[in-house]
Amino acid sequence: MGVKFPAVRKKLCARRSFFERCCFKLKAARLVAPQTFDFVELDEPTPVDGEAKIRIEATSVCGSDIHGIYHGATPEEDYPLAPGVPCHEIAGTIVESKTDELVEGQRAIVLPTRGMGGLSEYLVQTPDRVLPVPDWGGIDEWVMCQHTGTVLYSVKQMGNVAGKRIAVLGQGGIGLSFSMLTEKMGAQQVIGIDPVEARREKALEIGATNTVAPAKENMYEAIEDLTGGEGIDIVVDATGDPEGFGQCLKIVKRWGTFVSFSLTGSKGKIANFPHQEFMFKAATIIPTQVAATSQPTKDIREMIALKERGWADPGLLKSHNVGFEDVQKAYDMYSDQSYGVIKVVMDVNGGGA
């Protein structure tokens, strides 16, 4: 499929400097228009001192990529996007290392930088962005620790959740991670809220005590009934929807806690903000985004360790595997919430096991 915006084709050239140290070819996907991918062949990168080269074996779709980029929030003049974009949930095997901190043959989660996304067969990275994982278990399951690790950071901002009633609005990969972790940490009640039946079922499997189907019942009345009139101590917005912020303000009890994780694609706007509710509830509102902290990898590393010892398994959130060549299908599945998708992984270079 050709580039739909030929006037900006030259922008791609400026973005290729990352790949200039090379001797072989790799395949990478990129967005050339809203909701439209194609593949490009690029020179394979070679690490310099202090870097390692990783063969990517599993890439996963993130909701923020869908809401913030895939649906067309990017200005038209920025297309085509850089190779590999949008994707930041990736894992693979170190095939060449020029740093004492990383060993060839080690599997790892990788956080891409330098404008390069994860929809690529290979990339190079510095050790601070490469997070080793054990050599057992499927790499397509270990990659789930990336997004659940970001949730681990957010859950820590809640303080002690033991004995608390918690509602999580949205039960995609992020929302389900909140349901799983807060239950593990001793929450008295965890209510998963989502219109998709498959996601509500998964919520009950991994820790939620109750679920609410907002398309079928009055969400606020259902929560009132489920809590016996006690209300929600902590509410989480994991929707990626501009309506989510206001809905959470209505859900949380007076003087409760509202944890905002959601990133929307509507230029950051909040829809139907309930100002009266905001003033009356006087809730503590905590925006959480681990990527904006000084230690963006700390909680992901901790999540890897927690999975390794069996405390919690983010791998349970993976619902589908597709081939790398089916990148368009993978993003469409996530966007449409079709086939009961929760987290879809693309197997790259024969990965997925």
What residue spans do the PLM features occupy?
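C-terminal capping/lid region of NAD(P)-dependent oxidoreductase domains
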Residues: 16-25, 229, 259, 266-267, ...
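Glycine-rich beta-strand-centered segment in the early N-terminal region that forms part
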Residues: 45-60, 73-114
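NAD(P)H dinucleotide-binding glycine-rich loop of Rossmann-like/cofactor-binding domains
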Residues: 88, 108-169
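Mid-domain Rossmann-like dinucleotide-binding core that forms the NAD(H)/NADP(H) cofactor-binding site
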Residues: 141-217, 221
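Glycine-rich cofactor phosphate-binding loops and adjacent beta1-alpha1 units
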Residues: 161, 206-283, 353
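C-terminal substrate-binding/catalytic core of Rossmann-like NAD(P)-dependent dehydrogenases/reductases
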Residues: 269-319, 328-329
